[in-house]
């Protein structure tokens, strides 16, 4: 695998494809930069992480919010720190429920543009509510409000990731995965760094290479009307992001849903019919994987869906009993690493499904009612 991860040319001529393809290279660039910033990061973070009762909230809007859903569970268990994921869209509407003035707070704000109204307002509300509040924005846009406000603040460390991750396409692709990798490297450098993460970059590069010019589609083409992504733990966050990619790039022409395998039985399974594609992200953890495989086998026995596809790192009798994708060979991946692999398939599927349905992936909202940077938000001042 070439060390610079040179991406293949975009066969579709879209920014979205180009941005999907350059992800492995962007990750290593960003993590190499974080290696260089390690001393400065430690100077900022180490005193904070020693604070008793420190809360660490991962926040963002839309796709940027799902970063926290994917990585916060692992960061909390791995570091023993109080990580949680709360969208800016919840922080802004209900600050009194999430911002506790009695505990110090580190707010990690993710943003592609750094200009979403809720993201800017969440920082201001956190400062207003919590006397001892600190900020670590991770953003793709040097000119964005998140970054510019942070570099002029004495309670913040601004982390800028490579400019090419400021996706020009409508949907966030390289931006979400590079912000994910960067945050993991900041808080778990012994596990996620520019050297160890090459295994993830290599595997994802192999996935993209295996898909050729993307024209055959990831899951083939069929007249499905619905898609459901399922994943356990942090992989439910990856499932949520995968579903949003389909909704965004097809402009809602293909209905998309997400859940956990165990949660899916509790009502949502009702949506499965003979026009439904179900994709199960199979966990790499041997305990969790049992639950994923139980549901996979059940869905196939039900014989209600048009197709049920498993994506897994290794095969088994249950996986191999129906349509499946086995990840390219590599070392054992924990689920937070495996999420990057699953997103390669999901992003590519959404792109090609968009084109297949006659959409323009870079500007999928023909009506203009859904925007790349959200519009129409009125921020109401908090008055205690």
Predicted stretch roles:
Residues 49-202, 281-321, 325-330:
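Glycine-rich phosphate-binding loops that contact phosphosugars or nucleotide phosphates
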Residues 67, 71, 174-179, 238, ...:
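Catalytic-loop motifs flanking and including active-site residues across diverse enzymes
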Residues 56-59, 231-234, 337, 341:
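Alpha-helical transmembrane segments of integral membrane proteins
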Residues 1-17, 24-25, 29-30, 151-155, ...:
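Phosphate-moiety recognition in structured ligand-binding domains
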Residues 1-5, 138-140, 222-227:
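An N-terminal domain-start capping segment
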Residues 94-96, 167-172, 265-266, 335-343:
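Short, charged, surface-exposed secondary-structure boundary motifs
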Residues 18-46, 51-53, 151-279, 357-384:
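Active-site phosphate/pyrophosphate-binding segments
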């Amino acid at each position: 695998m070439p060390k610079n991860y040179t991406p293949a040319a975009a066969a579709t001529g879209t920014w979205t494809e180009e941005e999907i393809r350059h992800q492995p290279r962007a990750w290593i660039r960003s993590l190499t930069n974080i290696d260089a910033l390690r001393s400065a990061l430690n100077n900022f973070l180490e005193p904070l992480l020693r604070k008793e009762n420190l809360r660490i909230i991962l926040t963002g809007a839309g796709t940027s919010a799902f970063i926290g859903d994917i990585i916060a569970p692992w960061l909390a268990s791995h570091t023993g720190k109080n990580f949680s994921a709360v969208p800016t869209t919840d922080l802004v509407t209900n600050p009194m429920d999430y911002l506790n003035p009695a505990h110090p707070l580190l707010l990690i704000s993710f943003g592609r543009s750094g200009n979403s109204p809720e993201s800017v307002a969440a920082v201001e509300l956190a400062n207003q509510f919590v006397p001892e509040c600190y900020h670590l924005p991770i953003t793709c846009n040097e000119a964005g409000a998140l970054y510019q406000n942070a570099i002029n603040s004495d309670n913040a460390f601004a982390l800028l990731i490579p400019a090419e991750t400021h996706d020009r396409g409508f949907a966030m692709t390289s931006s979400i995965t590079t912000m994910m990798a960067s945050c993991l490297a900041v808080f778990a450098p012994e596990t996620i760094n520019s050297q160890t993460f090459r295994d993830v970059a290599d595997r994802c590069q192999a996935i993209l290479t295996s898909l050729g010019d993307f024209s055959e589609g990831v899951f083939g083409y069929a007249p499905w009307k619905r898609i459901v992504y399922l994943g356990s733990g942090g992989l439910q966050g990856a499932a949520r992001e995968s579903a949003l990619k389909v909704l965004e790039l097809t402009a809602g022409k293909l209905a998309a849903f997400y859940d956990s395998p165990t949660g899916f039985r509790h009502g949502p399974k009702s949506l499965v019919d003979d026009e439904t594609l179900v994709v199960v992200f199979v966990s790499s953890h041997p305990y969790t994987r049992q639950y994923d495989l139980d549901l996979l086998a059940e869905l196939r026995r039900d014989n209600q869906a048009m197709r049920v596809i498993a994506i897994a790192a290794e095969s088994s009798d249950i996986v191999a009993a129906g349509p499946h994708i086995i990840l390219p060979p590599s070392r054992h991946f924990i689920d937070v690493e495996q999420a990057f692999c699953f997103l390669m398939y999901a992003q590519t599927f959404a792109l090609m499904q968009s084109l297949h349905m006659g959409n323009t992936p870079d500007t999928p909202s023909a009506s203009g009612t859904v925007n790349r940077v959200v519009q129409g938000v009125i921020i109401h001042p908090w008055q205690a």
